[in-house]
């Protein structure tokens, strides 16, 4: 298998603290670049854990279609602005941030007061505009999760009618693009591939960490396949042949041989197949003539038994 290398050829931080990283991975065998690119993209876009604002409480507001006196934005605008905030919580517990601002003021993300467990990535992002002589009191809830979690109206906490739920986007990666280039022809004339992958995050994690975490998830997914233990189905007993089911009476044995076998609990050909020639001779009153008779009767239906126990 080819030993490939990973090079980060570009890293940018935008004004909103979003980060872009571009990586080159290669050389790879034909087809491997597509496999890597698709797998990494799926995990990067939907499998990484992140943080998001999941609910907002605004003093004096109990539904999302309200307006706030002295505030330029309506409640829906404020909820949308909060939804777009990039935050990074280092705990799995619910975290709450609060602010109280008196106008005139531009209310920004950095005005939110959190515990030391939560970092606001883009502190300059606008939340609302408060006019002179008015104030805004606001509370946001931050949780960790994976993927996208829409508001479940059926399970909303009706006891907190002023807590406005938000569709939560936990995905720390905003965009992933990849392209595949052919590299120099290797020995033997086989063409190699190189994967170029661009990862854009919201700033709560770096592209390097996002790539590493997605790779670790894929390793954990595939690792059990390397040590698969096959569980064999219990073997089915072979069905007995039609000949073995023939009753003893149909062998047309002499009365003496028939009676001796019956006394020995031999009732069918299948019972006889457990005997050797020596075993037949040990049956009481069963001589060599009767044994030969049984051997001949069995041979007529295509069955033979061993001469001795050791050759069975």
Swiss-Prot record:
Q: Could you say which enzyme class this protein belongs to?
A: transferase
Keywords on record = DNA-directed RNA polymerase, Nucleotidyltransferase, Transcription, Transferase
- A cellular component term, taken from the record's GO annotations: cytoplasm
- How does it associate, per the subunit comment? In cyanobacteria the RNAP catalytic core is composed of 2 alpha, 1 beta, 1 beta', 1 gamma and 1 omega subunit. When a sigma factor is associated with the core the holoenzyme is formed, which can initiate transcription.
The record's domain comment reads: The N-terminal domain is essential for RNAP assembly and basal transcription, whereas the C-terminal domain is involved in interaction with transcriptional regulators and with upstream promoter elements.
UniProt family annotation: Belongs to the RNA polymerase alpha chain family.
Q: What is this protein called?
A: DNA-directed RNA polymerase subunit alpha
Report the source organism: Prochlorococcus marinus (strain MIT 9313)
């Amino acid at each position: 298998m080819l030993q490939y290398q990973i090079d980060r050829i570009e890293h940018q931080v935008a004004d909103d603290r979003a980060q872009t990283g571009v990586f080159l991975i290669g050389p790879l065998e034909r087809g491997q670049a597509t496999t890597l690119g698709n797998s990494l993209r799926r995990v990067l876009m939907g499998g990484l854990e992140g943080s998001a604002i999941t609910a907002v409480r605004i003093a004096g507001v109990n539904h999302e279609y309200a307006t706030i006196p002295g505030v330029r934005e309506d409640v829906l605008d404020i909820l949308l602005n909060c939804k777009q905030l990039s935050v990074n919580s280092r705990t799995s517990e619910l975290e709450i941030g609060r602010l109280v601002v008196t106008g005139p003021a531009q209310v920004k993300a950095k005005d939110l007061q959190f515990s030391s467990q939560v970092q606001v990535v883009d502190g300059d992002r606008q939340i609302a505009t408060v006019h002179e002589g008015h104030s805004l009191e606001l509370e946001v809830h931050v949780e960790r999760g994976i993927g996208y979690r829409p508001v479940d109206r059926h399970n909303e906490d009706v006891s907190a009618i002023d807590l406005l739920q938000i569709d939560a986007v936990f995905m720390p990666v905003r965009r992933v693009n990849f392209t595949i280039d052919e590299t120099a022809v290797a020995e033997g004339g086989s063409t190699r591939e190189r994967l170029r992958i661009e990862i854009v995050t919201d700033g709560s994690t770096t592209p390097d960490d996002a790539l590493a975490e997605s790779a670790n998830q894929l390793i954990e997914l595939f690792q059990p396949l390397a040590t698969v233990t096959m569980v064999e189905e219990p073997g089915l007993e072979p069905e007995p042949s039609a000949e073995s089911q023939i009753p003893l009476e149909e062998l047309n044995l002499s009365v003496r041989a028939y009676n001796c076998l019956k006394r020995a609990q031999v009732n069918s050909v299948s019972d006889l197949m457990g005997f050797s020639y020596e075993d037949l001779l040990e049956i009481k009153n069963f001589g060599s003539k009767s044994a030969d008779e049984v051997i001949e009767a069995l041979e007529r239906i295509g069955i033979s038994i061993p001469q001795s126990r050791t050759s069975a």
